[in-house]
Amino acid sequence: MISLFKKLYFTFSRSSRIIITLVIIDQLTKWWFINNLRWKPGLMLKVTSILNMVYTWNYGISFGLMREYYQYSNAIFLITNMIIVCYLYHLMICSKTIGSFVGYNFVIGGAIGNLIDRFCRGAVFDFIHFHYRNYSFPVFNLADCFITLGVIILIEDYFSTKKVIEETSKENFDNLQIEAMAAKIRNTDHVSNDKI
């Protein structure tokens, strides 16, 4: 029982530092853009030929989806996001690899960053806008980057872990076959010796 508490404390303290750092980075960048640039919604700052900084409030979910239901759904978004964060935290505590631990931390940190916006401001502040020729990617923020990076880490971890498990299983299966053949040979030798 004590070892379980030690594991939970160790996991909580490590993950808390990562998550809090990501949330602080996200909230500081949003605060800086909102307060120092004194933009108005719709204005844009061209950074490069493919990157703009824009002032946008996202009243929907990721990438502005479902924003037309904002009046009815902000409370639902908040509750749903809190439930998802709690579930992801549970998965992170149960994670067996460093990759999944880090991936869940990034997803949780990004989700909490956006959750703070929705709770304190009623919407999520987005400011990063990539575009190329006629293609325009939806406006996003650093919390969205953290979530995306976390999902990529989790996917990579899943496939690399799956590969290791498959290789280990095949190796174990091959070893079992060799042991079975050796036992069969020993039994055959034993029977042959009995006949002599």
From Swiss-Prot:
HAMAP family registered for this protein in UniProt: LspA (MF_00161)
Membrane topology per record: Multi-pass membrane protein
Keywords: Aspartyl protease, Cell inner membrane, Cell membrane, Hydrolase, Membrane, Protease, Transmembrane, Transmembrane helix
Family: Belongs to the peptidase A8 family.
PANTHER family from the UniProt entry: LIPOPROTEIN SIGNAL PEPTIDASE
Primary localisation category: membrane
Residues at the active site: D126, D144
Name of protein: Lipoprotein signal peptidase
UniProt xrefs under InterPro entries: Peptidase_A8
Protein's job: This protein specifically catalyzes the removal of signal peptides from prolipoproteins.
Top-rank EC class of the record's enzyme: hydrolase
One GO term (biological process): proteolysis
Annotated compartments: Cell inner membrane
Catalytic activity: Release of signal peptides from bacterial membrane prolipoproteins. Hydrolyzes -Xaa-Yaa-Zaa-|-(S,diacylglyceryl)Cys-, in which Xaa is hydrophobic (preferably Leu), and Yaa (Ala or Ser) and Zaa (Gly or Ala) have small, neutral side chains
Coiled-coil annotated residue ranges, if any: none
One Gene Ontology MF term: aspartic-type endopeptidase activity
Parts of the chain that traverse the membrane: 43-63, 75-95, 97-117, 135-155
Pathway assigned to this chain's UniProt record: Protein modification; lipoprotein biosynthesis (signal peptide cleavage)
EC numbers on record: 3.4.23.36
GO cellular component, as recorded: plasma membrane
